[in-house]
């Protein structure tokens, strides 16, 4: 997994460097984009056990590449008849988006592509109640709060389209692979903020964004 992480980070750096040095032609105004996810708040209306708030900031390098930083917060509650689990924390993803549409089609307004991300989650997990039954009866206990850091990589295909001038909507599918859970192989967190199910190596997800675009340089 460490080799995979090193390779993934190298790929992101190479992609950014290549984009920064290859801007021979720009057919539209490069933009800074600020976005807020609405899927998390809407999902919270239906399920009060999961609150997810996140957004992203992206900066165009050229007509088909953009650097992206995503940040967010998540609070998760899980209850069963014999235990309760709580997890909350902040997460960040860094990476690059690649627009597969040609500049004449995208015009800085449309996106259909894929992103590469490296994610970090700093979270606090605890089990305030735990009950175990054995031959002599039931035993209750708890696991105190513990702060951990998890690492993961991600592919994020998605689409975006402009509704009004400099205002867009779009969705992103999250295909995540856990590199390090932060808790060791024998004790896994049920839910990792920004990643998902901490007991699985692969965790999918989805976001739906409202995006505000700000042109920052005139087209050549």
Q: What would you call each of these model-derived segments?
A:
Residues 30, 49-53, 88-92, 110, ...:
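Residues that define the transmembrane beta-barrel architecture of outer-membrane proteins
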Residues 65, 70-135, 207-214:
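Gram-negative (and chloroplast) outer-membrane scaffold detector with strong preference
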Residues 45-47, 78-81, 122-129, 180-184, ...:
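Outer-membrane beta-barrel proteins
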Residues 40-43, 78-84, 101, 139-145, ...:
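Extracellular loop and loop/strand-boundary signature of outer-membrane beta-barrel proteins
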Residues 162-220:
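Predominantly the C-terminal beta-signal and adjacent terminal strand-loop region
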Residues 20-60, 70, 209-220:
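Short glycine/proline- and aromatic-enriched beta-strand/turn motifs that initiate or cap beta-hairpins
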Residues 21-31, 64, 102-111, 163-169, ...:
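Short loop/turn motifs that connect adjacent beta-strands in outer-membrane beta-barrel proteins
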Residues 36-38, 55-59, 94-98, 116-118, ...:
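Residues on the lipid-exposed face of transmembrane beta-strands in outer-membrane beta-barrel proteins
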